[in-house]
Amino acid sequence: MKGKITIISAICAIFAAIIPAKAQFMNGPSYADLNDSETVRAMKEHVSTISAAVMEGRKAGSEGERMTAEYVTGIFKKYGVDVLSGKDGDVFGIRQENGDTLTSRNVIAFIQGGDKALRDKYIVIGARMDNLGTDTMTIDGRTVDRTYYGANGNASGLAMMLELARMLQTNSPLLGRSVLF
């Protein structure tokens, strides 16, 4: 058994040495060009703004979440996407088991499809705005305030959604179905 494993390992090593181990690129833009594109720059700006300290972690119902909703609304409008909610989103509540109501916000935007037969069918694209917010904890006997900025707590998802909205709005004549964000 040990001999079979040695032979199989040797064969795998030979094939690994034969196959080129470098990435293969087709003709076209380089990684540096892609990283410097309008879309990537805009996404970085969105993530930076949405996860900024002033947003205080965007906890549901917080001022930071309200400011994020206002930012998202402004970007949709800048991109020419119809916004169906208020300037800082629509507030909704979720009743919890203990009787408290957790409030949060939604921003709703819309691009109408160009095909009369399909425009009443919808593609729904979403990303959550809220994140963990802030908390206070005790570490080694001292109180520490912590902010969960949330760049990967869906600021990146919001950025992707905003740039997708821009691209879809730019190409809206090609859309058959309507898109709801």
Q: What residues fall within each predicted segment?
A:
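Bacterial Sec-dependent N-terminal signal peptides
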Residues: 1-26
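N-terminal hydrophobic or amphipathic helices/low-complexity stretches enriched
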Residues: 21-67, 72-82, 120-122
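Second-shell loop/turn segments in exported
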Residues: 28-37, 53-63, 93-98, 143-154, ...
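Sec/Tat-exported extracytoplasmic proteins
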Residues: 47, 51-59, 72, 79-83, ...
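Acidic/His- and Gly-rich active-site-bordering loop/insert found
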Residues: 50, 76, 97-139
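A non-catalytic alpha/beta surface segment that caps or lines the substrate-entry region
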Residues: 58-112
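Short secondary-structure junction motifs
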Residues: 86-89, 120, 176-178
